[in-house]
């Protein structure tokens, strides 16, 4: 169907409104002696002036060519882009003054040849070192014949810059976060392994302490025969002393390893703070993209208004304005999606930080429990020393020996209780480490999704 005859109802309405705009002008300048020819001449001058004003005052570069490629309109904004005076460009062939990425023909020529809207696929450099992108629509006569092209050439340097910065930031986040998450995962695995090893140690110590308790109970039961079995009691005391010494050494080792794990947890917290800071930087870039999209929407709105005022002659320009507006809205929607992903990543990171804090607390409590166990072991060793001394003085110190034996039994029971508590705490710590490992995997998935 001939474009000039399509959608007649809509065009009639637009022409009527445009006529009212023109009538307002003609009514103010009506000459009682004027004939129809003069009126048509003034109407022609009115629309010509409106068109030229639109081209001259439009905030982006405008390039209009005739069907043969001759430049007919070239506004000052486009002169700024191309570093070429308007007077030097008018009347020249478009291929001589405006080169594009197309090799076989210029984009204005493609618009005239196809009779369709043409948009440059990739932006190109202009003499001002800016990046521009051509959008062209065909200009049609009332018969529907293409008589030229109307091109808008906006400066998209800032938009491209922001897109490149966002891409670079994606790459940085992917690299840095991946490295930090790997370290975090290793630290959590280390916590889990340490917790399992220490839990096993606690179980062994419980068995040892129960054995010591049994031995001390046997000593207490046979206190009346201590004179005849002094050597046996002395040997048992020595074994208890050796085990207490081993327990002290093991407890000190456990304290050192827990301290190292606590430092790892603190480094993980610092890493999470760094992730939060990078998320804030991404939010700032998203805000900048949203601002640019808002400004682009405003330009598209102004262009639509000017196109409505221009009536049929601005129809092609309205198509360009709608396309620019659609691009701006799509950019804003993508920015909002990325911003939501950042918010979710920050929330998950904050939860991870809380769990790490809980892990640190559990480690501190475990260190306290081990220190208490160490104190108990030292008391056991001291009590065993007293027992050994009592054995040597068995003849005159039977009552003292019995009291020392009871103290060893009580202290051993206390050590068993402390080790049992430590075993429970380490089991809880192992569960927390497993949960943290799962959370790290979730963050890694979110980062991969964000980069994609």
Swiss-Prot record:
Low complexity compositional bias, start-end: 229-239
Function: Mediates chemotaxis towards arginine. Probably transduces the signal to the histidine kinase CheA.
Domain of life: Archaea
PTM remark: Methylated by CheR.
Entry protein name: Transducer protein Car
Gene Ontology biological process: chemotaxis; signal transduction
GO molecular function annotation: transmembrane signaling receptor activity
Keyword Cytoplasm included in the entry's annotation: yes
Keywords: Chemotaxis, Cytoplasm, Methylation, Plasmid, Transducer
